[in-house]
């Protein structure tokens, strides 16, 4: 339950989690959040909703870093305490914490501070590199396109694996084949008009898969310019 914005700003977020869990056919419900909504009261409701995993995406390890990168005044120490509280009541909830290397000052040990601070409070913890997914946007500090989010050499792909295991549903019901399609150039259906199974098995997505398999992703303008497929997907 996440795409282009902060999911927990949606007043119906917890209801969405409960609805998804009540179906009984979903392996995992998760979200990625900046964690600004966390705190006593909300934390209990979050755990009670049955959500399986949250990924906390943070902007640094001090209030000063947040002001520099996120341009907001942020009480970092208070945030850590809110995460600590969530961890203490989490039950089966998995908590992952990530940040990007470009937001840490390695010369003064902020990478170590990140691990020391969140390591005891998380089931998974990651420092990622910024990778440019969209040629329309300049990303300051992004690693070279031949290096992935973890500094490994990328393997060029001719077929995007997203097409065969995922869909991305926007807030208005428009369905894209992947989360990178932020401007919906590849819209393949609308849940207000047809079921998700009909879209998954539909002609538009089938044709897109065919283009990738037989011509390569470069034959699709939106896919050919994508950086994420090479740096952020598995074979």
Q: How should each PLM-predicted stretch be described?
A:
Residues 103-106, 126-145, 182-185:
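Flexible glycine/acidic-rich beta-alpha junction loops that bind and position SAM and/or redox cofactors
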Residues 137-159, 186-203, 207:
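Acidic, low-complexity intrinsically disordered segments
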Residues 161-163:
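Short, small/polar residue-rich loop motifs at catalytic or cofactor-binding pockets
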Residues 1-124, 128:
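Radical SAM/AdoMet-radical enzyme domain recognition
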Residues 174-175, 179-235:
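Flexible mid-to-C-terminal extensions adjoining Fe-S/redox cofactors in radical SAM and related proteins
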Residues 35, 101-103, 130-133, 181, ...:
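Short, solvent-exposed coil/turn elements at secondary-structure transition points
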Residues 170:
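Short, acidic, Ser/Thr-enriched surface-loop or helix-capping motifs
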């Amino acid at each position: 339950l996440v795409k282009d914005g902060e999911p927990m700003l949606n007043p119906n977020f917890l209801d969405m989690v409960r609805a998804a869990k009540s179906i009984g056919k979903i392996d995992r419900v998760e979200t990625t959040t900046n964690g600004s909504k966390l705190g006593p009261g909300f934390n209990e409701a979050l755990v009670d909703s049955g959500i399986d995993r949250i990924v906390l995406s943070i902007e640094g390890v001090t209030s000063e870093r947040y002001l520099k990168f996120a341009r907001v005044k942020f009480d970092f120490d208070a945030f850590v305490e809110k995460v600590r509280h969530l961890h203490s009541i989490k039950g089966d909830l998995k908590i992952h914490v990530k940040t990007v290397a470009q937001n840490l000052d390695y010369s003064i040990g902020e990478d170590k501070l990140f691990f020391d601070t969140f390591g005891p409070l998380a089931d998974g913890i990651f420092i990622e590199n910024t990778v440019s997914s969209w040629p329309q946007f300049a990303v300051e500090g992004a690693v070279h396109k031949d290096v992935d989010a973890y500094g490994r050499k990328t393997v060029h792909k001719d077929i995007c694996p997203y097409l065969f295991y995922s869909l991305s549903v926007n807030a208005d019901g428009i369905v894209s084949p992947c989360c990178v399609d932020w401007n919906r150039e590849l819209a393949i259906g609308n849940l207000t008009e047809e079921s998700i199974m009909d879209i998954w098995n539909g002609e538009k997505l089938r044709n897109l898969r065919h283009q990738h398999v037989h011509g390569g992703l470069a034959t699709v303008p939106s896919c050919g310019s994508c950086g994420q497929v090479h740096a952020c997907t598995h074979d």
